[in-house]
Regions:
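PLP-dependent amino-acid enzyme catalytic core
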Residues: 1-497
Length: 497
C-alpha cells in the first residue's frame, strides 16, 4: 500500500516519500509527516535473525513506498558499509545498569552518520524518480554534528552542492576542525555570529523565501535540507531503535514482548521522535525518556504543557543540544492534536510571534509515553566521572546528559525495566569536556590532541579515524558572516545576483 505525506500546517498538501525527501520542508513552512505510521510486518523473531542492513530494509520499505526494492536496497548497501568501523553498525554495550546504543561508529563519529550516510543516496534516487534536472543545494544549519555528517555524506555527490552554517562560538574545537577541513568541490562551510537557533531560523527563512527560490530555479538550482526536518533523515533513525530491540532479544537480555525504556539526549527532538515512531510501529516501549541539558525548554514543556523559548540561551558542554527552538517537536504536536493542521499552525504561529504556546489538557494526556528531565553541567560531568571510575567505560557529554536523566527517572519511579540509552557521539568528539570531567587538574594543561591520545590510553580504545584525519588537515573553509547575511552568502557562493 502506498504511503503519502502531509504537511503539519495544511490539509492541502499530499506528496510521495521521494517528493517529501526532495523538498525537505513543505511550501507552507510545515514538516512532512506520514498519513499513518505503518506497523512492522516482520515478527521480532524474524528481525532478530537479521543484520542491520536487513532490518533497515524491513523498516524503511514501509515508509518509502515509491522506492522499488532494488532502489532501496542499493541505497542501504551504499550507506552502511565499510564507512562504519563495526559490522554491527550500531552495537549495544551493557554498562552501569543500562544498554548504551552506540550510534557513533560512522565516518564522523556521531549519530548523525546513521541517517546522513543514506540521505544522499535517497535524495539522488528521489531526483531521478521525479525527473529533476536542477542541481540540489543542500542547505543545513548545524549545532556541530549534523554539519560534518552532511558534508561527509554529500561531498562530491554528483548533482548536489552542500552549504553548512554553524555558530562560530557554539561548537567544540574538534567539531569545528572536522567541518572547516572538509574536502569536496561541492562543499562550503560558513561560521555565523549567532547561535544555532539563529542559523536554523536563517535556513528556514531561505526555504520560505519565494523570490530567492525563483532566482535559484532560474540558475538551475533547488533547495533541499539535510536537517532532521527532512523525512529522509527521520526514517533511517527509526531503524536503530528497532534493531536495538532485536539485539536485546537475540542476546537473551529480554524476553518476547517485554517492554523497554529508551533514553534520548535531544535538543531538536528528531532522535526521540524516531523512537516514538518505532514504538508506534510495534516496538514494545514502556517509557520514552527525554533528556535535556540546561537549555531545558523540552523538560519544561513536558512538565507544564507550555513551550516557551523566551529564556536565556546557555552554552553548555553538550553543544549539539544547545537549542531553544525544537523543530521536530512540531511533528509530535501535530500528531497529538489528532492530525489537526490548522490547530498546529496556530500554535507554531504563536511560537513565531510570541515565542511560546500552550497545548490543551487533552493533548497533554497523549504525552503519557514520555518522561522529561534535565541535567546541569555539574551533574553531566559527575556522571562521566562516576561511570568511568565504576566501569572503565567513557561516554561523551550528550550521552552523559541521558545517563544522568535516566538515574533521575529511576529515582523518581523505581522502574526496573530494561533500558536503552542512545549514545549519540564518541567521547573523542568532546575530548576536553570529557577529560575535564574525569580529572580537570590533571589534564587542564594538555592540548586537544594530547587529550585525544590520553583518552585513548585510559579508555583502552583506538583513536577513531575521523580524529586522526584532522590532526594535520589544512583549513579549507574560513568564511564567517553575521546571522543577517546568510542569504547574501548563499547567493554569492552560487553566483546568483
Amino acid at each position: 500500500m502506498d504511503l503519502y505525506y502531509r504537511s503539519t500546517r495544511s490539509d492541502d498538501v499530499r506528496v510521495t516519500a521521494s517528493q517529501a525527501i526532495l523538498k525537505g520542508l513543505a511550501d507552507d513552512g510545515g514538516l512532512y509527516v506520514p498519513e499513518s505510521i505503518p506497523a512492522l510486518d516482520a515478527s521480532f523473531e524474524e528481525l532478530s535473525g537479521m543484520d542491520y542492513r536487513q532490518v533497515a530494509y524491513e523498516v524503511m520499505k514501509l515508509f518509502l513506498t515509491d522506492f522499488t526494492e532494488e532502489e532501496l536496497k542499493a541505497c542501504i548497501n551504499k550507506a552502511y558499509d565499510s564507512k562504519f568501523d563495526t559490522d554491527e553498525i550500531a552495537p549495544l554495550v551493557k554498562a552501569d545498569g543500562a544498554y548504551f546504543l552506540e550510534l557513533f561508529h560512522g565516518s564522523t563519529i556521531a549519530f548523525k552518520d546513521m541517517a546522513l550516510s543514506i540521505l544522499p543516496h535517497l535524495m539522488i534516487t528521489s531526483a531521478r524518480k521525479n525527473n529533476i534536472k536542477n542541481d540540489i543545494v543542500i542547505l543545513t544549519a548545524t549545532s556541530g554534528d549534523t554539519g560534518k555528517a552532511a558534508l561527509a555524506g554529500f561531498a562530491d555527490v554528483e548533482g548536489t552542492k552542500i552549504r553548512v552554517f554553524y555558530p562560530k562560538n557554539g561548537v567544540s574545537p574538534i567539531q569545528e576542525k572536522q567541518m572547516v577541513t572538509q574536502k569536496g568541490k561541492n562543499t562550503y562551510v560558513v561560521g555565523i555570529h549567532g547561535n544555532f537557533d539563529d542559523a536554523q531560523t536563517g535556513v528556514k527563512n531561505m526555504f520560505g523565501d519565494k523570490v530567492l527560490n525563483e532566482e535559484l530555479n532560474a540558475g538551475g538550482y533547488q533547495f533541499s535540507s539535510a536537517n532532521s526536518i527532512n523525512i529522509g533523515r527521520l526514517v533511517p533513525q527509526i531503524v536503530y531503535y528497532v534493531y536495538a530491540y532485536t539485539r536485546l532479544l537475540a542476546d537473551g537480555e529480554i524476553s518476547k514482548d517485554e517492554k523497554i525504556n529508551i533514553v534520548v539526549p535531544t535538543g531538536n527532538f528528531g532522535n526521540i521522535l524516531a523512537a516514538y515512531f518505532a514504538m508506534h510501529m510495534g516496538v514494545p516501549v514502556n517509557k520514552l525518556i527525554c533528556a535535556s541539558n540546561e537549555n531545558k525548554v523540552l523538560y519544561d514543556f513536558f512538565a507544564t504543557g507550555t513551550y516557551d523559548r523566551n529564556r536565556e540561551f546557555v552554552l553548555t558542554s553538550s553543544p549539539s543540544m544547545d537549542i531553544l527552538i525544537s523543530s521536530n517537536l512540531e511533528r509530535l504536536i501535530y500528531m497529538i492534536a489528532g492530525d489537526d493542521a490548522a490547530r498546529n499552525k496556530e500554535l507554531m504561529d504563536s511560537l513565531k510571534t510570541e515565542g511560546r504556546y500552550s497545548i490543551t489538557p487533552q493533548m497533554r494526556e497523549k504525552l503519557s509515553d514520555f518522561y522529561g528531565n534535565y541535567a546541569s553541567e555539574k551533574e553531566t560531568a559527575d556522571v562521566i566521572k562516576a561511570i568511568y571510575e565504576d566501569t572503565g567505560y567513557v561516554i561523551d557529554t550528550h550521552t552523559a546528559v541521558a545517563a544522568c536523566v535516566y538515574k533521575k527517572y529511576v529515582s523518581d519511579t523505581s522502574d526496573k525495566t530494561a533500558t536503552v540509552i542512545a549514545s549519540t557521539a564518541s567521547p573523542f568528539k568532546f575530548t576536553r569536556s570529557v577529560m575535564d570531567a574525569i580529572d580537570k587538574a590533571k589534564y587542564d594543561s594538555m592540548t586537544d590532541f594530547e587529550l585525544v591520545d590520553e583518552l585513548s590510553r585510559i579508555a583502552n580504545v583506538t583513536v577513531p579515524q575521523a580524529i586522526e584525519d584532522i590532526r594535520t588537515a589544512p583549513v579549507l573553509h574560513d568564511t564567517v558572516c553575521d546571522k543577517t547575511q546568510m542569504k547574501d552568502v548563499v547567493k554569492k557562493i552560487l553566483n546568483i545576483n
